[in-house]
Amino acid sequence: MNIKRAKEEIEHTVRAYLAKDALGEYAIPAIRQRPILLMGPPGIGKTQVMEQAARECGVALVAYTITHHTRQSAVGLPFIRQRNYGGRDVSVTEYTMSEIIASVYAKMEATGLKEGILFIDEINCVSETLAPTMLQFLQCKTFGNQAVPAGWVIVAAGNPPEYNKSVRDFDIVTLDRVRRMDIEPDLPVWKDYARAAHLHSAILSYLELHPQNFYQINADVDGTQFVTARGWEDLSNLLNTYESLGLQADEELIRQYIQHQKIAEDFAAYLDLYYKYRDDYGVEDILAGKAAPAAFAQLLQAPFDERLSLVSLLLSGLETRFAASRRADAVADGCYAFLKETKKAFAGMPAELAQEPNCWAQLFGQMTADYEAETQKKRTAGLLDKPALEARLQTAKTLRGWEKTLLRAAAPDADTAFKVLREQFGTLSEARDTAQQRASAALEAAFDFMEQAFAESQEMVVFVTELTLSPAAHAFIAENGCERYFQYNKDLLLDHRKAALNQELEAEQRRHGML
């Protein structure tokens, strides 16, 4: 099973386990809600899919790496309590609440979400003293004498023994009480995630050329060499930040993330060439519609990997513009929705308060503060992905700027105050239109270059396919259109259908002994 399918299964399970009947009881009793056990190699993305699943299901998430805990923190600390049994006073040992269970209640209190996912990582790598506690947790859904609260779905994760020397096998009794999912690395599925997360284009194009280098764990005389999906993503974040700071990444730095000598050397060499192609071909000039004649001449002698790298660079430049347009859209939409609520609030202002100086700015400021508080609450609950969080933060920043403008205007009545805000929104709308026009112009310029340089070659197929697979590009084109994209995509689909029909025909002929 790949990680995408596992995520879907987790989401479906959460919805099924939290579904309620007509009486408000959980449709599947807690005793029949089997914990999910994810088994897969390290760095494959198990923790990240838990965050995504919780966010998409609208529930809280408490995540623990159990190898960081002792028996005392998992079970609780012992203390002596006096009891009377059969008329005789005795001292008995009880336990404080487990730190993990306490964290669940703390999360409920902080977020207001009463249902969620309790995720325990590396569950089969615990120490000998903690192993019985983990078995009890999976079998009985308790830590010590404290049960996991109702409405919390248990998901655990572990590594197969070939990846971790500390692994302890579960017995059949335990395995018969869980839902086990075995997860394997899958580059095409990971690339779907990488596109949506805007991972560095050099990494995506490199793995397109060298898919075998996506995930490897090799043991030799010098120790274990490895490269994982987590390593590529963390390296991507660093490369993007280095570029924004004008810093250069070298092989020594890459080895800190890609801990496989041969692959690190290979990617470092590719990254140097990638930057060289960006400068030699003038990617920004191409997207501005000013491609140099020398670029076309250089492509005539270029090998396929160089041509593919150039296509990746063009797509990266477009992706940046699509993302900027999407952010501008999201902020404008957020401000528009806020202004609709503001208009209602202005209309409902009591007459006696409407006479106070700057009352409109004060009301607007209070509403903005409420918006910021709501954003923080959703952020704490993990209900906002990165684009949604960025949009809300930028919206709040914009609203604070409007508040200052409203204060300076000292509007005497609601109509005047709202007119000031409407003018501010007009400026914001112009900025959104500018971002959209810039992205559309760059897309047209990219098609101009692709047609002149590659016509209908394999490079054009890659270009159109990547536009189709990119969430940002797909959303932008669906909203704003691009005639040439639709035409090339239509031709590509027709070619695929013809190829599929030919394959079916050949298979049918083979079955009947005609070939």
Question: Which residues are covered by each model-predicted region?
Answer:
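Alpha-helical lid/collar subdomain of P-loop NTPases
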Residues: A196-E352
